[in-house]
Amino acid sequence: MFGDLMVFKAYDIRGIYGRELDENFAYSLGKCIGKKFENKKILVGNDVRIGSKELLPYFIVGLKEYADVFYAGTISTPLMYFGTKGKYDLGVILTASHNPPEYTGFKMCDKEAIPLSPIEEIKPIFKKYELTESIKEEAKNLNLDDLKVNIIEEYKKFFLKRCKASDKKIAVDFANGATTIAEKEILNELFDNAVFINDYPDGNFPAHQPDTLKMECLKDIIRAVKKNNCELGLIFDGDGDRLGIVDENGNVLRGDILTAIIAKEILKEKSNAKIVYDLRCSKIVPEIIEKYGGIAIKSRVGHYFIKKLMHEIDAEFAGELSNHFYFKEIGYFESPLLALNYILKAMDEENKSLSELNKEFSKYPHSGEINFRVKDQKYIMEKIKEHFKDCKLEELDGISIYCKNFWFNLRPSNTEPLLRLNLEADDEKTMKEKVEEIKNLIAKLDASL
């Protein structure tokens, strides 16, 4: 099938360049989106990936047949949201986020920076168009400078005014991704005492995959923090919408712990604020929110669902286990820079190191996300429900089961035959025992199929 329709996901379009996403797909996609947004203003940017840069001119040529196109250059996803909001009818960035270098893709948002769901809004209108020699020639000769708009200066101006300069010694791993452009300049001005690594753009990602969650991708930042005696380290993913943090000892802080730290600081400013957290997060998150006068709202996993919910309920902040942090202040989208600003504020106001804050908020042992490759997701989830029938059940996203001294969420992957488990308990022993129990149960059920 042309342009395998499996590339259309809930949150984006993503696939391997040259195999699942090629120039013909990019041109056809551009033309379909252009028709949908005929005579509208569309902002387009790209990350540093080789596939993104190769597909860009074909995508723009398709768009230009129907819509007015403006090119922002090589930018991060938060910068695309920032540039689109209130100024353009649609924003599109060619990116595959934290995936390996052979991938590319497309993320889209409307004029309020709310994500479009490709599987719901683009896949139904997608069709193949012929990539003629004249179209190829037009793409080859496309002068991007003729379409160029500068959205970086306004972005830099906003964050340099909003974020407090710090004398803390930090290390930053840019992972050779999109944040090596604007975000690097901002951090360079905010910190006099910063160590930058992997800080030049390279779509081959020579240092490591640009993923803030995989331990093998965090070795460089951990090493840099220890070697340079830094007070904290941060790492961006490939398109700059995730922020990973390590403390002065090189220990990684989970996304839900960071969510709790940031939420506490926000609630010092706005005590009755609504704060959203994804259902995988530790129960320390709602406990902290409620302790400091906030309203804790649980959400499905994923930026598409979280941003829509934030808009609907007018939430001040949202955080995910996956290191996405969203702020009403800038339009309900991700901002690693604002997240960092609040983390530094917590360290200053509490007069604590990051390791001390991590210890304070890491009250409950958490398994982290564990993946299981299974033959039948639905069958296994039903059997797990039966096994824990005496516990409280929620089905907001997969199944969440709440028992006396532990709870867990088991949900299917949208894109792979996987089940994802997150489990938390009141003590380490129970956590390990229950993870093992569920692992064995899933293995037994899968073997029976």
UniProtKB/Swiss-Prot annotation:
Gene3D superfamilies hit by this protein: Alpha-D-Glucose-1,6-Bisphosphate, subunit A, domain 3, Alpha-D-phosphohexomutase, C-terminal domain
Name of protein: Phosphomannomutase
Domain of life: Archaea
A GO molecular-function descriptor: phosphomannomutase activity
Keywords recorded for this protein, A-Z: Isomerase, Magnesium, Metal-binding, Phosphoprotein
EC number of the protein: 5.4.2.8
Pathway: Amino-acid biosynthesis
